[in-house]
UniProtKB/Swiss-Prot annotation:
Alphabetical UniProt keywords: Plasmid, Transferase
Record-given protein name: Alpha-D-ribose 1-methylphosphonate 5-triphosphate synthase subunit PhnG
Enzyme class: transferase
Family annotation (Pfam families): PhnG (PF06754)
Gene that produces this protein: phnG
Amino acid sequence: MMDAAKTSDDAGVAQRREGMRLLARATLGELSLAWDAIDDKPEVAPVRGPETGLVMVRGKIGGGGDPFNLGEATVSRATVRLSTGEVGHGQLLGTDKARARLAAIFDALFQSAAHRASVEALHEQVAARLDAEDRRKAEETAATRVDFFTMVRGED
């Protein structure tokens, strides 16, 4: 029975992690429209932030070398608590504190059964946009691709 509970918890953690990844990539417009579309908004209280800071980005040459400090990246984060008790966290690259706050709100709403469907709809919308952007970039890259080949020259 413990294994089934652990598997369920692991699936929930993975689902929330994927949701937080999508929220970090969502635009301010997408987040704002989704927030405005919610009718029964709970009260939101800040726990931390939103705040902006720096994190050290680490890298490895070839994926197998020793790690080294590549440089610093600006990040924004926020933590909020809903009036219904859920706590949400939002982290993203850049300095957009409003996006970090909204991402934290949607992370908290995702934990609420009453709002999960609207948050999942936002996740799907962001995922569709990201997939379209990836396809467009792949098509642009394919258009500039150069195929090299070697011709065997006969002896004269």
